[in-house]
Amino acid sequence: MKKVLAIILGGGAGTRLYPLTKQRAKPAVPLAGKYRLIDIPVSNCINSEITHVYVLTQFNSASLNRHIARTYNFSGFSDGFVEVLAAQQTPENPDWFQGTADAVRQYLWLLSDWEVDYYLILSGDHLYRMDYRLFVNRHRDTNADITLSVLPVEEQVASSFGLLQVDHSGRVTAFSEKPQGEALTRMRVDTTDFGLTPAEAAHKPYLASMGIYVFNRQVLIDLLKQSPQSTDFGKEIIPMAATDHNVQTYLFNDYWEDIGTISSFYEANLALTRQPQPPFSFYDEKAPIYTRPRYLPPSKLLDCQVTESIIGEGCILKNCQIQHSVLGVRSRIESGCVIDNALLMGADFYQPFAERDHKIKNNSVPLGIGADTIVRRAIVDKNACIGRNVKIVNKDHVEEANRESEGFYIRNGIVVVLKNAVIPDNTVI
């Protein structure tokens, strides 16, 4: 894979994931107790022996830069790297990134310097495990100009994706972005041609683009230069290229989740606790997911009842109930608490005992979850200070609310407590 250069698209402002993206880029959003979203595509690259990786981003990239710099340091005997390329204004390009294709176009001067055969374009907000070597080999074996990774999907969700029609060789013959009604029906394909059983094909009669592409080097350069007004791969570049280029497909029939919204992010995290078999597992020695080593002590559980949950490193839990939840590193939960169907991201630091004691004596709220608090169907961002006898339960069943001044939002019926928020004692949300 020495002839492959990976380009991970960090995405835009992350408005669908707000407020989790208020102070961080979308790829830097914490995941599964100890990881960040960017760790997924980068780990897939490393496990696929692709070690030349750029990450393109333009919003709130400080924490992403810090995470990548601390995590992905290849040895001095390797030429591998993972490097962030932030949007910048130049005399030739006075605007910020206008879309996925425009982001790559603005850095063509750098990307084209690499003597590679293929560019691998990836997204920074998907949860999946893929061996990109199989993807690139499919591209090479079919003499393709462009290859798209596609996913068989059922009709209920098909209109949320860019859909493809293909011939029996797997070549793309038509492309439609998020079709509805009759246009959706016309995009049905026989997925048994891709190895699905008749029963699976009947359930999943559509092929959806995953937003993951392999381009021949010169093909990508030519397409971006010939169409300077085209800013998006899925909506413009790929449909245009399908008319006169060999655009092939690679079927990925495994777990894949676009976690670009609060609802999908919440569900994907809690699905990791599902028994007996979660849809995605971080416990795979052959293809591990890497992240920054923190050298934290083991978690300490004092008289706790924990059911179907994931507890990160360095947590301190006292006489509490944890049910179907994910707790991030350094989470602290006091006695009498109930954490139910919740995602707690933990903390960036430990608060010394003397400081905690001083805050409690002065009726202030220390870091963590205070005694006798209930957190149900919620996301609590890092470094939140939740007081005693607080109830975060969305008691009025609100779907959407902006209470930023009070330290929380409600998105899709899920309460999201902001990073560094302080929720006073006896608050009911």
UniProtKB/Swiss-Prot annotation:
Quaternary structure annotation from Swiss-Prot or TrEMBL: Homotetramer.
Reaction(s) this enzyme catalyzes, per UniProt: alpha-D-glucose 1-phosphate + ATP + H(+) = ADP-alpha-D-glucose + diphosphate
- Identify the EC number(s): 2.7.7.27
Q: Name one GO cellular component term.
A: carboxysome
Q: What is the protein named?
A: Glucose-1-phosphate adenylyltransferase
Gene (name only) = glgC
- Which keywords fit this entry according to its UniProt record? ATP-binding, Carbohydrate metabolism, Glycogen biosynthesis, Glycogen metabolism, Nucleotide-binding, Nucleotidyltransferase, Transferase
An example molecular function term from Gene Ontology annotations:
structural constituent of carboxysome shell
Q: Which family does it belong to?
A: Belongs to the bacterial/plant glucose-1-phosphate adenylyltransferase family.
Q: Which GO terms describe its biological process?
A: glycogen biosynthetic process
Q: Which Pfam families match?
A: LbH_GLGC, NTP_transferase
